[in-house]
Amino acid sequence: MRCPFCAHDDSQVKDSRPTDDGAAIRRRRQCEGCGARFTTFERIQLREMTVVKSDGRREVFDRSKLERSISVACRKRPVDPARIERLATAIQRQIETSGDSEIPAASVGGMVMDGLKALDSVAYIRFASVYKDFREAKDFEDFAGAVSEAGRDG
């Protein structure tokens, strides 16, 4: 594997173990060129998925982008990073097992919304503000009010 520091082509695996959720293998590597250490993750990919954007563009599904979006919504919230990882894994598996090779971005966003709703209400509202394209403070108020009402009812 190419070193991210010096671009040397060879590295040696020093340690290998499964992640906490068992969905990936974490490998500690050491570059044979510069001696730097870095970590890689190996994940199972059932098949290549394409996300269809609202404007019709197509992008290859990128798990890191999904995980980053969830992490941004959860920033400065008491959410364990392992739970973010598990949510991303669950969404990825749901997408991969859907039977379709293409999935609308809106469907992915809906899955994230569902997952965040169960994870953290503030993260849920943060994500919704982008996903639902809130334009004014009133949009936040209305949505947060609905979330608050649902929390009291359920």
Curated annotation (Swiss-Prot):
Regions annotated as coiled coil: none
ATP-cone domain ranges (all copies): 49-139
One Pfam entry name: ATP-cone
Listed Basic and acidic residues bias regions: 7-22
Region span, Disordered: 1-22
Zinc finger map (unnamed): 3-34
InterPro entries: ATP-cone_dom (IPR005144), NrdR-like_N (IPR055173), RNR_NrdR-like (IPR003796)
Assigned keywords, A-Z: ATP-binding, DNA-binding, Metal-binding, Nucleotide-binding, Repressor, Transcription, Transcription regulation, Zinc, Zinc-finger
GO molecular function: ATP binding; DNA binding; zinc ion binding
PROSITE patterns: ATP_CONE (PS51161)
Cofactor info, note text: Binds 1 zinc ion.
Cofactor names: Zn(2+)
Biological process, per Gene Ontology: negative regulation of DNA-templated transcription
Domain of life: Bacteria
Family that this chain belongs to: Belongs to the NrdR family.
Record's function text: Negatively regulates transcription of bacterial ribonucleotide reductase nrd genes and operons by binding to NrdR-boxes.
HAMAP family in UniProt: NrdR
Protein name as catalogued: Transcriptional repressor NrdR
Taxonomic lineage from the root: Bacteria, Pseudomonadati, Pseudomonadota, Alphaproteobacteria, Sphingomonadales
